[in-house]
């Protein structure tokens, strides 16, 4: 899985 957050 690839997850991006700020």
UniProtKB/Swiss-Prot annotation:
Keywords: Hydrolase, Secreted, Serine esterase, Virulence. It is found in: Secreted. Inhibited by diisopropyl fluorophosphate (DFP). Its EC number is 3.1.1.74. Its main location: secreted. Induction: By contact with cutin. It catalyses: cutin + H2O = cutin monomers. It comes from the Eukaryota. GO terms for molecular function: cutinase activity. GO terms for cellular component: extracellular region. On the 2D-gel the determined MW is: 40.5 kDa. Catalyzes the hydrolysis of complex carboxylic polyesters found in the cell wall of plants. Degrades cutin, a macromolecule that forms the structure of the plant cuticle. Allows pathogenic fungi to penetrate through the cuticular barrier into the host plant during the initial stage of fungal infection. This is Cutinase 2. It comes from Colletotrichum kahawae (Coffee berry disease fungus).
């Amino acid at each position: 899985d690839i997850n991006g957050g700020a």
